Amino acid sequence: MDTSLIRELAELALAGSGQHCHEEALCIAEWLERLGQDEAARLIRISSLANQGRYQEALAFAHGNPWPALEPWFALCEWHLGLGAALDRRLAGLGGSSDPALADFAAGMRAQVRT
């Protein structure tokens, strides 16, 4: 399958979860899993849960998470749940990331949390 189509469908599912089209987004996540696109599928599931206010369930995906790009979602869940110590640890880890986008996220979130 064309990778650009896979990417567009994953983006559609993310947008859909933000618009409360969770069932549809999860259908796309299941399809992506069948294609071996596990990171994209996991992102959609986490986004859908977080957009429903189900932060604890979304945070459960953090255990054994092999994809650093998903860590900001877990930080947001920890913030919503008031898990300050866990959030501090996660932001410290992200701050030391070799990925500048993750390090920037950590710095920005730290600044927001302090205000």
UniProtKB/Swiss-Prot annotation:
Instruction: Identify one Pfam family in the record.
Output: Type_III_YscG
What biological-process GO terms show up in the record? Answer: protein secretion by the type III secretion system
Annotated signal sequence range? none
Effect of knocking it out? Deletion mutant looses the capacity to lyse macrophages, indicating the absence of a functional T3SS.
Extract the InterPro entries matched here.
T3SS_YscG_PscG, TPR-like_helical_dom_sf
Compartments in which it is found? Cytoplasm
Q: Look up the record and report any one GO term of the cellular component aspect.
A: cytoplasm
Tell me which UniProt keywords the record has, alphabetically. Answer: Cytoplasm, Virulence
Q: What is said about its interaction partners and assembly?
A: Forms a stable heterotrimeric complex with PscE and PscF/SctF in the cytoplasm. Co-stabilized by PscE.
Entry-linked NCBIfam families: type_III_yscG
User: Its function?
Assistant: Chaperone of the type III secretion system (T3SS), also called injectisome, which is used to inject bacterial effector proteins into eukaryotic host cells, facilitating the establishment and dissemination of infection. Along with PscE, prevents premature polymerization of the PscF/SctF needle protein within the cytoplasm. Required for type III secretion needle assembly. Also required for cytotoxicity by influencing PscF/SctF levels.
The record's family statement is: Belongs to the YscG family.
Question: What is the name of this protein?
Answer: Type 3 secretion system chaperone PscG
- This chain is encoded by the gene named pscG
